[in-house]
Amino acid sequence: MAQWIMLLLLTCLGCIKGEFFTSIGQMTDLIYAEKDLVQSLKAYIQEEETKLSKIKSWAETMESLTVKSTSDPEGYLAHPVNAYKLVKRLNKEWLELENLVLEDMTKGFITNLTVQRQFFPNEEDETGAAKALMRLQDTYKLDSETISKGEFPGTKYRSTLTVDDCFGMGKTAYSDGDYYHTVLWMQQALKQHDNGEQTTISKADILDYLSYAVFQLGDLQRAIELTRRLVILDPGHERAGSNMQYFEKLLESEKESNQINKLSVNPSEPKTYNGIYERPQDYLPERETYEALCRGEGVKLTPRRQKRLFCRYHNGNRNPHLIIAPFKEEDEWDSPRIVRYYEVLSDEEIEKIKELAKPKLARATVRDPKTGVLTVANYRVSKSSWLEEEDDLVVARVNHRMEQITGLTTKTAELLQVANYGMGGQYEPHFDFSRRPFDITLRTEGNRLATFLNYMSDVEAGGATVFPDFGAAIWPKKGTAVFWYNLFRSGEGDYRTRHAACPVLVGCKWVSNKWFHERGNEFLRPCGTTEVD
């Protein structure tokens, strides 16, 4: 039975090799893999203890025997049975003991470990997981100490970071040329080290990384201060000595330059806020707005706008099925109009969709704006799969339901996409519609007319869908769905619908979505009288 369980586990793990950090749903398999290894390790320990018990028993017997034999060797051997047993022991029984001592009890455990190791997370996964923590740190304005203490909202399990963990985080950032996070995490490692936490990491190693990272951020004075501490700890540290000379020479040059220019402020001194270095500028122009919305800040839903939002029963333009059983519809935003539908998916349907999707999950891709080729990107961290109606009746049923709710046809819509977000899982601001006029898909199916997004899980913290352009934040609620049009009736893209999936702070986020295309919907959503209808 155990062999069949192992085979099933390895089969599942074999299907999902790589980039575990991008999907919490797939990371759960690692929990069971680790549990199996613990059981295997305990079995190995039991075998070693049994072996050691036999050896100890033999040693005790031999000790009492040799005490007797060495007290009067000739008298002992005068007894022919003693003489025979001595020869027999040395010829056979000590050989048996030798074989027992040499018996390798590790074989079963090592075999299990070796087989499973090929499915373990790799260096890329560890780096991705570390960067995910840093992403959460930035988005939700968490200091390193809060993360190190495991103080996250809504968590059931408390877990802390050691000096070794913080040092590892800092090294990951350092290797990426990210000196801002290097400083944050090396400072935390140093703080915990100074507080007496047991660790294998030397303070000199921490100061070595920290001093150079601080220098890279432009804080020459502090770099010198930290390097001096390093030299005191390790006078023979070669790099520290040469760095000190270089830093002091730079400082002297700056002082001379300041005197010439009559400057009272060090021009290289970096900006700080409450003693923390300013975060470097990002490639994303709306970064601050996007992250503020993820935190629930900056939502522009004024009381006046709130009065325009209503709840109602939705019958899909008098669809016969929905007249009998209408859906609850709630306005989330007035312009552009975004609505939420309740009780769209049942718990049973959600679990079935997840079951179908999980074996197919692969790293979600984006289309390169320059080449048009699908590729993975750091700004989209999740895994997704595509489900066809032939996969299961539930897929066909859900597709039909979305068709009834929206009044649009699914004949030209894309397959049902299922996505699971991993550690710090996110999808930074993007458009659902294509802005490439020569995209071959546009010629056949038209552009992505509308988005129907199903929330298939609650999220304890984070994970909102936000619209930076007009300041809306929509929070996941299991079983509900949100819907909006990406195009005006004229077919022009509505650039206000640029949206993002915020990083998941605590929890596991599952969603599924359907993109409706223009073709087949010309009469179901006809053109308006103006370009912006």
Question: Model-flagged regions — what are they?
Answer:
Residues 2-481, 487-533:
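Fe(II)/2-oxoglutarate oxygenase catalytic core
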